[in-house]
Amino acid sequence: MSAFTPKYPISDEAMLDLLNKYPFLKFRKAYGSREPAYETDAENIENNYYKYWDGNGWEDLWKNRYIPRLFKLYDSWDDETKAKFEFMDVKEKYGELRIYTSVSTGEDSLNEIACDLSSWICADCGAEPREEGHRVIWTTGGWITNLCEECARKAIEKGVRTSFDDQLDAMKNVKTKPFGYTVYRLGQETKVIFKETEDGWLERDHVEQINKNNQTT
């Protein structure tokens, strides 16, 4: 959990309300345990999943896009499903935001969408650069981190990378294909294509079926 100053702070009173309404925001001593890691309200207000990415480039993605949709989905569940739900793990891996939960987010694909979007968001400042309408990002080698051009230049200047312009060009990635995923089953491909919403999330746009003869329907 980041100790940096949040871009989107929340009052202690509002945080406590969220913790009471959405208990999965509290840290647990161990996965599957109903015992909280912290005993007092003050400790839980300071240390919780809502504030997990405070000060990180993914804070907006986490607080303003992923979490509100998770709240809405959680509110739609029955009490039994709510009781089962918790975060199993939330972390950065290979430059992406990985979210593992005890209950699937189903067709909403919240965890997967957050992961896909995170790889095109600067992990340092939160910028989402585009060129000619396409998302673009600069990826470091070694410990993989996805950065905007400005933050990538700063990383190179700090000595994280040995060269400059050539290295910057080598780090650059441009997203030319839409977000989505493919399911393979019984010789047929099903492509689910997403479109971006006004608030920077993804939702299903259309589905393409590709049969054995490579024909799209």
Language model feature labels by segment:
Residues 1-108, 179-187:
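Long, charged N-terminal interaction/targeting segments
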Residues 81-83, 105-113, 135-139, 147:
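Catalytic phosphate/metal-binding cores of nucleic-acid and nucleotide-processing enzymes, i.e., regions
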Residues 94-96, 174-204:
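Acidic, low-complexity, intrinsically disordered interaction modules
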Residues 117-121, 141-144:
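Short metal-coordination and nucleic-acid-contact micro-motifs, chiefly zinc-binding Cys/His arrays
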Residues 122-125, 148:
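Short cysteine-rich clusters marking metal-coordination/redox-active sites
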Residues 129-134, 156:
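Short functional micro-motifs and their immediate structural scaffolds
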Residues 141-154:
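Cysteine-rich micro-motifs
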Residues 152-164:
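Short metal-binding segments enriched for Cys and/or His
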